[in-house]
């Protein structure tokens, strides 16, 4: 089953993306490099809980 997750910017801007993840194939925390428009550069986004 795919679960919804939130990817939060490590630049400290508060910008986030939402996506889904298959927990069986990827049990660890997700880290991916994506574009943060507030700082206008690609930064690492880390997985966080959706509240």
UniProtKB/Swiss-Prot annotation:
Molecular function per GO: structural constituent of ribosome
Disulphide-bridged cysteine pairs: none
Keywords (A to Z) from UniProt: Ribonucleoprotein, Ribosomal protein
UniProt GO BP: translation
Keyword DNA-binding: no
UniProt cross-references to Pfam families, sorted A to Z: Ribosomal_L33 (PF00471)
CC per GO annotation: cytosolic large ribosomal subunit
Highest taxon listed in the record's lineage: Bacteria
InterPro entries per record: Ribosomal_bL33, Ribosomal_bL33_CS, Ribosomal_bL33_sf, Ribosomal_zn-bd
Protein family membership: Belongs to the bacterial ribosomal protein bL33 family.
HAMAP family the UniProt entry points to: Ribosomal_bL33 (MF_00294)
NCBIfam families for the chain: PRK00595.1 (NF001860), rpmG_bact (TIGR01023)
Listed name of the protein: Large ribosomal subunit protein bL33
Encoding gene, per UniProt annotation: rpmG
